[in-house]
């Protein structure tokens, strides 16, 4: 944090400017990337994504119309109706046209990942069932400090995101361990070579 403070004092002595997302990001419609068949199988290679909570709906073996993304050229998938979004750095197809793929404009000189994190700070509740990116969401402004400040913020937040993912994985593993032993301990016919059921007589 001390390095971040130094960078802010160096590059942002008078505060930071704000820019609209519309001035930072371009969007692409998903039409050509929509999956044709919903017969998914985990043995297939290409994930089918939704920008909602489920994220990965399944995997397809379709080879055409795959959206190309990787670590060096990621994208943000944005649900045009709910305004939920995800960071994606792998190839994929999509389930429906209810999303947009966002990438930085060629003129943007900052950190795309910083923009993603800044978007997570936008508090907007989608009430009406209508598309929101063009009419509303893209008009929100985010702070844009010097690129070096952006990069340092991303490093810090990436580190915390990694910690959170590790904790979540640990919690999931502990939950599965708990359920295993709970079921094992409460299945008495598997303990001590079996058991006999006893009927209780209230008069005894």
What is each of the regions a protein language model found here?
Residues 1-204:
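Charged, alpha-helix-forming regions
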């Amino acid at each position: 944090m001390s390095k971040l403070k130094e960078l802010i004092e160096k590059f942002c002595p008078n505060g930071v400017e704000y820019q609209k997302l519309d001035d930072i990001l371009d969007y692409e419609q998903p039409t050509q990337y929509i999956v044709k068949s919903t017969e998914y199988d985990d043995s297939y290679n290409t994930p089918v994504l939704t920008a909602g909570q489920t994220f990965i709906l399944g995997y397809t073996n379709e080879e055409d119309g795959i959206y190309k993304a990787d670590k060096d050229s990621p994208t943000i998938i944005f649900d045009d109706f709910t305004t939920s979004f995800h960071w994606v750095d792998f190839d994929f197809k999509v389930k429906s046209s209810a999303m947009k793929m966002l990438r930085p404009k060629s003129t943007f000189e900052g950190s795309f990942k910083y923009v993603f994190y800044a978007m997570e700070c936008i508090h907007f509740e989608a009430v009406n069932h209508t598309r929101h990116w063009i009419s509303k969401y893209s008009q929100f402004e985010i702070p844009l400090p010097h690129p070096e400040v952006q990069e340092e913020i991303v490093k810090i937040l990436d580190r915390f995101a990694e910690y959170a993912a590790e904790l979540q994985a640990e919690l999931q593993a502990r939950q599965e361990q708990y359920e295993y032993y709970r079921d094992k301990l409460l299945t008495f016919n598997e303990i001590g070579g079996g058991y006999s059921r006893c009927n209780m007589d209230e008069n005894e």
